[in-house]
Amino acid sequence: MSKANQKIRIRLKGYDHKAVDQSAEKIVATAKKSGAEVSGPIPLPTEKQIITILRAVHKYKDAREQFEMRTHKRLIDILSPTPKTVDLLMRLDLPAGVDIEIKL
């Protein structure tokens, strides 16, 4: 494993910002404990999806209701990871509402 240009990029996505932040802190603490350099967590722009529906069925076109869904995202870069770092990250237990993408 050549350490010259090794980098692990982790993207976290979730609807609950507390769970996303908590997962990011766990990942950063685990990576630092194994001796790797960590850049982040970097907050990325929050996606906001708004859905508008009609409240009434027939003639009440002005009566509408809006719902929104926010997707919070964080980015973590682990620079010069060790084999111990990868092993500890694989064993890490994270909440169910957080989507994790890992790129090497």
UniProtKB/Swiss-Prot annotation:
Keyword Ribonucleoprotein set for record: yes
PROSITE patterns reported in the protein's UniProt record: RIBOSOMAL_S10
Gene Ontology CC: one annotated term: ribonucleoprotein complex
Sequence intervals crossing the membrane: none
Superkingdom of this protein's organism: Bacteria
Record keywords, A-Z: Ribonucleoprotein, Ribosomal protein
Keyword Ribosomal protein: yes
Signal sequence region: none
Record GO terms (molecular function): structural constituent of ribosome; tRNA binding
One Pfam family hit: Ribosomal_S10
Functional summary from the UniProt entry: Involved in the binding of tRNA to the ribosomes.
Quaternary organization: Part of the 30S ribosomal subunit.
HAMAP family assigned: Ribosomal_uS10
Family to which this protein belongs: Belongs to the universal ribosomal protein uS10 family.
NCBIfam families: PRK00596.1, rpsJ_bact
Name the UniProt record assigns to this protein: Small ribosomal subunit protein uS10
Gene (UniProt): rpsJ
